[in-house]
């Protein structure tokens, strides 16, 4: 790709998207982002020092019919790459269909329809930010003998994934991603773009802008924050699963743009498994100001817990395609927590 290429990033104010936009601008791309309001968009432009290669458009509700039409009517002839990062990720709902499933599917559908209507000849690549949640059924997550690969799919149906908020979130990622692959299959003759998906596990790592921590944080980072604020002798839920650093997620999007071998691939981002016990161990070992003030759980039992209680992820195909080393858990958690503590001290 030449660096005069224009990239559209949906959900531009999100945790992952801010890192992606920073990396795109550093690489010389022209970037158009979408945010929900003028206020959010203005705030974002200011954070990037009103970079002349960055502009923002308003998409109030990604689930609304024709949500992205205006953006592509206006910029369709400039945009060559589309990174669809916008998707609901929260568990504070009981109407799973309305708040998680439908918006995720409709958002994907509406951005692809807008490309077909207004940018069928110009958009060359679409990269959808999916999740490992699209690969594994939540009830299988604790099966120690199960191995998940780039070919795996979450087996939940539209109905069965509405059992609880976690299953519904995982279902929303599966059905949004399926929508993208099916759209391309059905519209091959009327669009020219190729499709890839990026499927990260739990995404940790520092915020692009530290002050984002003052306005609520993404769900994965919330796990680290809770453990930083845990009590001595306190119990914590030992979440476990695949993890990745946000800086690697961002880098993977850029590699997917630039490397033809990534076309048509599902890129599974995981640098191994984590559990909260391992995070607590890192916090106690690396931050003297926390030692003796937060929970300790059962130190050093993380690996044996994971062996028994988590399915395994084999993403060797992805690692070979991407060709770069991911952050390990210790560095990722240290950088995440250090930023949180710094912001806390300034408050």
Swiss-Prot record:
Location relative to the cell: Cytoplasm; Nucleus
Look up the EC number in the record and give it: 1.1.1.-
Q: Return any one Pfam family short name.
A: Epimerase
Query: How is activity influenced by pH?
Result: Optimum pH is 7.0.
Cofactor(s) the protein requires to work: NADPH
Name the gene behind this protein.
ARI1
* Disulfide bonding pattern of the chain: none
What the record says about temperature is:
Optimum temperature is 25 degrees Celsius.
Q: Hey, what's the signal peptide range on this chain?
A: none
UniProt organism field: Saccharomyces cerevisiae (strain ATCC 204508 / S288c)
PANTHER family hit by this protein: NAD DEPENDENT EPIMERASE/DEHYDRATASE, STEROL-4-ALPHA-CARBOXYLATE 3-DEHYDROGENASE, DECARBOXYLATING
Q: Which keywords accompany this UniProt record?
A: Cytoplasm, NADP, Nucleus, Oxidoreductase
Function recorded in the entry: NADPH-dependent aldehyde reductase involved in the detoxification of aldehyde inhibitors derived from lignocellulosic biomass conversion. Reduces commonly detected inhibitors in biomass conversion hydrolysates such as furfural, 5-hydroxymethylfurfural (HMF), cinnamic aldehyde, benzaldehyde, phenylacetaldehyde, and anisaldehyde.
* 4Fe-4S among keywords: no
Q: What induces it?
A: By furfural and 5-hydroxymethylfurfural (HMF).
Entry's Gene Ontology cellular component terms: cytoplasm; nucleus
- Binding positions (NADP(+)): 40, 169
Identify its protein family.
Belongs to the NAD(P)-dependent epimerase/dehydratase family. Dihydroflavonol-4-reductase subfamily.
Return one GO MF term: oxidoreductase activity
Q: What is this protein called?
A: NADPH-dependent aldehyde reductase ARI1
Q: Would the keyword Ubl conjugation turn up in this protein's UniProt record?
A: no
